[in-house]
Structures are given as structure tokens and as C-alpha cells.
Regions:
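C-terminal non-catalytic regions of proteins with extracellular/luminal or membrane-system context
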Residues: 1-166
Length: 166
């Protein structure tokens, strides 16, 4: 979350983004939308969901780190919200989120040190991927590049098959 806030604050500082109210929700080990998250989705214009999958089990139905992002995207879509999924680690999880209206691959999950707060000029090391993905999401940076791997489709049980999705 800190790296996302940093990226947004940097965009505001650079006059690439204005008039934004940011609300966040950190999910960990929960697979369903609670009332707090539901209210946040309902009151938002745009939904950005970050996913972090480090192994094939995280792509299967029943895995909290797959189910909650999917549920958030589904609920946002039901309310006609713009939804974006940011894949933070391995891009294979994109196949699990074909319900998102847009997908961004950050290809790096190392965020900022949370002890630095929301500063524009961090002094501790951090990964550039998450802040840069905020630039892509908000249109300040044009996405470029090609994934170095194919993203296969998923079977209903969350296992990968040989059909290339992306």
C-alpha cells in the first residue's frame, strides 16, 4: 500500500494527477468481502486490486489470495466501477483475473519501507515497479514491453492448461 500511495503522491506532485481521494484496504488471509470493504467499493469510482501469487496453489479456487481479488473485481463490475488488477509478482496470476477490465503487470513486489510514511522522497531502498504501475493505471505512463513468458489459461480447478491466454 505504501508504494501505491507513493506512486500516486508522486503523480500529484508532478501534476500528472489531481483531484483524487485515495482509500485503501489491506487484505491478508481473508477470502470474502467484509462489510468495510463492501462499503469502500460502493463509495469508490475506481477499484485497483493488487495480487500477489507466488505458486500455482494461489491460482486455485479456495485460495484467499485468489478469491478476494476476484470477488472485489466481480463486485466492482456489478456496480459498473472501473476495475484494474495489478499483478505484483509472477504474471501467471493474470489468468485468474480475466474478470478485471484492465490488467497491469508490475513484475516486482518489493515495496517501500512502511516506516517512511507517505514521503515523496524516500531515503530507504524500494522497488520502482509498484509506483511505476500507478503511472500506468492513471495514464501518466504509457505501458510498453512484452511479457517474457506466455500466460496460460486456467481450468475450472485453477490448474494451468496448454492454451495460451496472453
Amino acid at each position: 500500500i505504501h508504494s501505491m500511495k507513493f506512486g500516486i503522491n508522486r503523480l500529484i506532485h508532478e501534476n500528472s494527477l489531481n483531484n483524487i481521494k485515495l482509500d485503501t484496504y489491506e487484505y491478508n488471509n481473508i477470502g470474502i468481502i467484509d462489510d468495510v470493504l463492501k462499503e469502500k467499493i460502493e463509495s469508490s469510482d475506481y477499484i485497483i486490486v493488487a495480487s500477489l501469487s507466488s505458486n500455482a496453489n494461489h491460482l486455485k479456487p479456495g485460495a484467499w489470495n485468489r478469491d478476494l481479488p476476484r470477488s472485489v473485481i466481480d463486485y466492482g463490475n456489478k456496480l459498473n466501477k472501473d476495475t484494474v488488477l495489478i499483478s505484483l509478482r509472477n504474471p501467471y496470476d493474470l489468468a485468474a483475473y480475466d474478470n478485471a477490465k484492465a490488467q497491469v503487470v508490475a513484475y516486482g513486489f518489493k515495496g517501500m519501507d512502511p516506516t517512511e510514511g507517505d514521503t515523496l522522497f524516500p531515503t530507504k531502498s524500494s522497488g520502482p515497479n509498484i509506483p511505476a504501475s500507478m503511472g500506468v493505471v492513471f495514464g501518466a505512463v504509457e505501458p510498453k514491453g512484452k511479457l517474457p513468458v506466455d500466460i496460460p489459461s486456467l481450468n475450472n480447478d485453477g490448474t494451468m492448461n496448454t492454451e495460451v491466454n496472453y
